[in-house]
From Swiss-Prot:
Disulfide bond in keyword set: no
Superkingdom of source: Eukaryota
Annotated protein name in UniProt: Pleckstrin homology domain-containing family G member 6
Domain DH residue range list: 161-353
Amino acid sequence: MQAFGPPNEGPLQGLVASRIETYGGRHQTSAHSTAGNLFPRGGPGVDPSRRRLQHYVPFAKGSGQTRGMSPLVLREPDPEKRHGSYFGVGPPHSPKLKEVTRAHELEIRLHTFSMFGMPRLPPEDRRHWEIGEGGDSALTMEKSWKELVLEHKEMNRQLCHQQEALWELLTTELIYLRKLKIMTDLLAAGLLNLQRVGLLTEVSAETLFGNVPNLIRAHRRFWEEVLQPILEDTRTSGQPLDPVSLQNGFLTFGQRFQPYVQYCLRVKQTMAYAREQQDTNPLFHTFVQWCEKHKRSGRQTLGDLLIKPHQRITKYPLLLQAVRKRSPEPRAQEALNAMIEAVESFLRHINGQVRQGEEQESLMAVAQRIGPYEVLEPSSEEVEKNLRPFSTLDLMTPVLGVAPEYTRQLLLEGPVRVKEGREGKMDVYLFLFSDVLLVTKPQRKADRAKVIRPPLMLEKLVCRPLRDPNSFLLIHLTEFQCVSSALTVHCPSSTERARWLEKTQHAQTTLQKLKGEQYIQQKRELLALYRNQGTESPSTRPSTPSPSPEDSQSSAEGRTLEFAIIPRLVVTEDTDEDTPSMPDDASDSGYGTLIPSSPKDSHSPLNRLRSKALRRDPRLTFSTLELRDVPLRPQPPDPQAPQRRSAPELPEGILRGGSLPRRAPPIWSEEEDETLASGNVVVETLHRAQRRSPLPHSPTHTDSAGESPWESSDEDEGLLSPELRPRSLREDMLREIREELANQRIDGASEPEPGNGKPRRLTLAQLQRMRVPHIIQLDTPLSTSEV
């Protein structure tokens, strides 16, 4: 019969031929036959003697061996199928055939992934996409908190509800972590493995899932450092979960989950990109469907997985509020309030960043609608060439004088007619932004409008309504508040005019408020910077901002009143060895001037500076001191140089007529005491003073005026040569010692003979009596003023 002839010998006829045509003969091929073929690109050759049987196997009714023989093994692929064609038409390298071949190869790859699992990524991709391989064993929990808490049956209802709320926080954290792993271990890993063999290379895995690994790492650290320890404590002790243990972890919520800022900024673009790829890319749509049907996906769609991070980060305050509602203890309430505030503060930060990003995108879209900047008509090509670098308007620049996070916004736009001077009306299109008004003219052949007038800054703009209900006047001022330009704006209706005036006035008010807030914020930051520098500075000068003239005057008056009265003191020392020496802040060594009006226990830095300064200068030992010679606030050029301090304040007991406290014995030996009987007491006293306090040879320190406080001025000592100054100092000290000794009333000492200016020599007994406490005698106070 002709029907049993070779398949390639003319058209087939008869019943068998019709069956062959129906089930896929040489003239028609079904997609299922090619899809089920193990050798679509040409496999092992088939014995020519068996080629005639390959089309008749499905209808054979012979033995069981023949019935069980697979037609895929006996059938030889058609020549067209060796090129990957489903339909056997067209050249093998046409775009349609390539697409069909890629779809078939994608199905084979996905089937291989289902059978043998997802291949591991290459080493260059593992570092970013693989998170904690083998570390998921710690991400396990019991089915209920009652398995951990031993005495859960004896707990009251409110405490049980608290444990349920805490358990919900822990369980939802693990569930969310597993959903994040679906995106990296299934979707991202599958896409990257397909791209390694040349499939879906046009899809960006970084755009879809680039920030997800950072989210997983953040949540794993949060689980290991915050949530898992409280779970382990309950497992060990059997006590209920303590919400206070979560406080330290949630107080650092913002630092832990910084990757959410970037993710939330890009989530809308990511979801739009995923929808676009599914709608326009059949291969990607096939891949996504395979992933959604995978057993690991849990019937989660790609859109559901991409929106999960945004939903999770906003759910933390609700979970903590549920725990707080069921925690009556004040300690737990306080801790939970702090945790909720930390989380909500971070969410406000994210919302601000998202809002700023949306405003930036909106401004960019508006900026693309505004074309060239042609506010001048150049007179020549040379002029035009020089104007070209300055003929670009960039609306993306920040607004001047406001916080950097504030973005310029488009408030109003619309067509109007303007008139400038005596010229006729012109149709323009106005753009009202947060800080500027643009006058543009639409272009017929383009969608962009060109700027025809210089930008009108709102802070220099004045709007005045005119008698015409549809018109108002725009006046632009200079820095000198003079008119720069004026435009008469004619709106289509009175409603439009009212709308333009209202929006412009509101924008000006808002801009002024924002600039005021920014000025206050900058002033606070500057004051804080000054305070920080003052704290770190080693100088004794208090580091404060520059005071106003009124403050400086009041402070100077206060210091003048404090040191206005400086008494003359005649000081004697007690050298009793049995009396312990008093501390410097409660006694006077006789080297300084005590102030009667000072409080008893004054420990001001100025007094300590003066005390040290007086001890270092021997010329102040037996002389009356005037504070004008000692700067109140010295500024040594070397921070390591010794600082001058003030003299200690006069104790209250001294002010009431008491004696000075006793000091340590003077620096001389008993042998020197024996020599005093035959020596001159004035000379010996001067000798001891020079030995005890030699003139310092340290580098001279200068005060704020650039003068040395230890150098005698010309007004006090006159213009003396260096050779005469020591002698003058010696004579002054001798004269002052004579006056001090003359004012002392020593028991048992006879008055000196009249006419004899030299003091009489004292015996050892008289000298010992001089060492006992004596009453301080004050001379007439001297009024001094600070220079």
